[in-house]
Amino acid sequence: YQAANILLKIRAEKQLSQSELANLTGKKQSYIARVEKGTQNISVQTLNDIVESAGGKLKIEVVV
């Protein structure tokens, strides 16, 4: 799942644990873990908030 890959990439590049990312974003560590495992749905807005909290920028591309 794309959201899981995005969170894993952010954590790897920023060298953050799940707990550290959770603290940055105001989410619980268990929520971050569930998103990364693909067992938790996440809205685009929440994903964007997490990415921005970690200093990134979410871009969505639509190809038709």
Locations of the language-model features?
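Short, conserved catalytic or interaction motifs in soluble domains
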Residues: 37, 62-64
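Helix-turn-helix/winged-helix DNA-binding modules
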Residues: 13, 39-42
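Short basic helix-loop element that most often maps to the first helix and adjoining turn
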Residues: 5-24, 49
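Recognition helix of helix-turn-helix/homeodomain-like DNA-binding domains
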Residues: 25-40
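Generic alpha-helical hydrophobic packing signal
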Residues: 7, 27, 53-56
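DNA major-groove recognition helix of helix-turn-helix/homeodomain DNA-binding modules
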Residues: 45-61
